[in-house]
């Protein structure tokens, strides 16, 4: 993906270590890029070794002097995630920011979602958060004591509060993640570890780019096509969100700028939400 050429932010996160799961593309890659720009050392993971290496090379080109660690990890494999946490600390130091980003949505209705599909979707949405959080929590707690702040941030979806019938399993799982975030926030607060999430709406991603490539009206460019989609979906800002816009919200919640915020979800949907 092409990341925007925005002015470099201050390096206020120098000396801190961040972890981003699902970091090889989209929101994860944009988040890693922003964290590096602000001076943090960043460890990222993904399941596809080729895409992960391409992401690492891209980030290295943009941040030649930064500390970057990229390793293939399936966050649903608990033992591998525990080993990865040890590897990250050895390579970069103890972690104070964890961004849980792994997990895509499933398109299915109640009628055509099998028991196996339900279990697979619930496992993906919950354990892609549980495994990394368990593995890195000891480091986060130590850094909260040492630095005065540490945080877990989870990428969630507007489906959590605004379910769609064609994504019934994903909508239900996303709603559960809202309460998981609140529960962890309460439990981890005595250790100084904050837990928050973001609710993303329609974000420019590979999914939408593939639909654009298959569009019937070949006269439309991306801006016209995606704008029409946004208007059809009744998004007030009349466009899709960009990965870097979601990344800005994630980094805000991960860094000390949000030091008195925990158990919350920030809406990043372009005004698409209709919930109270």
PLM feature segments, named:
Residues 2-9, 162, 250-251, 262-276:
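Short C-terminal tail/terminal secondary-structure segment
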Residues 17, 24-25:
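Conserved glycine-rich cofactor-binding loop
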Residues 99, 189, 194, 261-263:
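Short, small/polar-rich loop/turn modules that mediate ligand/substrate recognition or access, typified
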Residues 109-110, 114-122, 231:
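Substrate-binding pocket helix/loop in short-chain dehydrogenase/reductase
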Residues 133, 173, 181:
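Active-site helix of classical SDR
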Residues 138, 186-190, 259:
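Alpha-helical segment proximal to the catalytic Tyr-Lys
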Residues 157:
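Residue(s) in the substrate-gating loop at a strand-loop-helix junction
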């Amino acid at each position: 993906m092409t990341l925007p050429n925005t002015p470099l932010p201050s390096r206020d996160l120098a000396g801190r270590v961040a972890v981003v799961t699902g970091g090889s593309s989209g929101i994860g890659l944009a988040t890693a890029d922003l964290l590096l720009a602000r001076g943090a050392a960043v460890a990222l993971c993904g399941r596809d070794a080729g895409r992960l290496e391409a992401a690492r090379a891209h980030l290295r080109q943009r941040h030649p002097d930064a500390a970057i660690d990229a390793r293939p990890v399936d966050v649903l494999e608990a033992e591998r995630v525990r080993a990865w946490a040890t590897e990250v600390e050895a390579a970069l130091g103890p972690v104070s920011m964890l961004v849980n980003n792994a997990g895509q949505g499933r398109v299915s209705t109640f009628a055509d979602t099998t028991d196996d599909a339900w279990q697979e979707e619930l496992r993906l949405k919950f354990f892609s958060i549980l495994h990394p959080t368990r593995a890195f929590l000891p480091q986060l707690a130590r850094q909260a004591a040492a630095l005065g702040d540490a945080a877990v941030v989870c990428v969630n979806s507007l489906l959590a509060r605004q379910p769609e019938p064609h994504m019934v399993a994903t909508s239900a799982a996303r709603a559960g993640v809202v309460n998981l975030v609140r529960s962890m926030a309460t439990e981890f607060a005595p250790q100084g570890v904050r837990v928050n999430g973001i609710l993303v709406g329609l974000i420019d991603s590979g999914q939408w780019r593939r639909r654009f490539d298959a569009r019937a009206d070949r006269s439309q460019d991306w801006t016209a096509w995606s704008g029409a989609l946004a208007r059809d979906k009744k998004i007030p800002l009349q466009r899709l969100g960009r990965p870097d816009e979601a990344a800005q919200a994630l980094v805000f919640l991960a860094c000390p700028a949000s030091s008195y915020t925990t158990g919350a979800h920030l809406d990043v949907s372009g005004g698409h939400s209709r919930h109270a």
